[in-house]
């Protein structure tokens, strides 16, 4: 139940951020001087190596995906092992403490 409320709250925050972001952008663009300074800074400090950053970002994503997959499989096998041993213990009738 808590998960659904959390999802609803995040969805509302996302919708509000999307709805109000153009309004804030228009409000910021109304003043000409900060725009000129902002655009000058943006073009003056352009990224010299965008390909390198993209490549690094791809590598980081692959590492995160691989790590998540391995962790998920390990957790699933641990839960399955615990469930099987609990079912066997229930069927046999033993009440021994599980090893940790």
From Swiss-Prot:
InterPro entries: Pilosulin. One of its GO terms (cellular component) is extracellular region. Glycosylation is critical to maintaining the aqueous solubility of this protein, but does not directly contribute to its activity. Expressed by the venom gland. It is found in: Secreted; Target cell membrane. Glycans are attached at residues 85, 94-95. Keywords: Glycoprotein, Membrane, Neurotoxin, Secreted, Signal, Target cell membrane, Target membrane, Toxin. Residues 18-50 form a propeptide. Residues 1-17 form the signal peptide. It comes from the Eukaryota. It holds the Pfam family Pilosulin. Its main location: secreted. Neurotoxin that triggers pain behavior and inflammation in mammals, and is paralytic and lethal to insects. Causes a time-dependent increase in cell leak current. May act by targeting membranes. Not detected in the venom. Belongs to the formicidae venom precursor-01 superfamily. This is U-myrmeciitoxin(01)-Mg7c.
């Amino acid at each position: 139940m808590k998960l659904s409320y959390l999802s609803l709250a995040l969805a509302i925050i996302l919708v509000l951020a999307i709805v109000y972001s153009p309004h804030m952008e228009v409000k910021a663009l109304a003043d000409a001087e900060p725009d000129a300074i902002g655009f000058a800074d943006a073009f003056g400090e352009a990224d010299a190596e965008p390909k390198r950053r993209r490549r690094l970002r791809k590598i980081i994503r692959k590492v995160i995906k691989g790590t998540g997959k391995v962790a998920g499989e390990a957790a699933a096998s641990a839960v399955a092992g615990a469930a099987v041993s609990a079912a066997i213990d229930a069927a046999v009738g033993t009440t021994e403490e599980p090893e940790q």
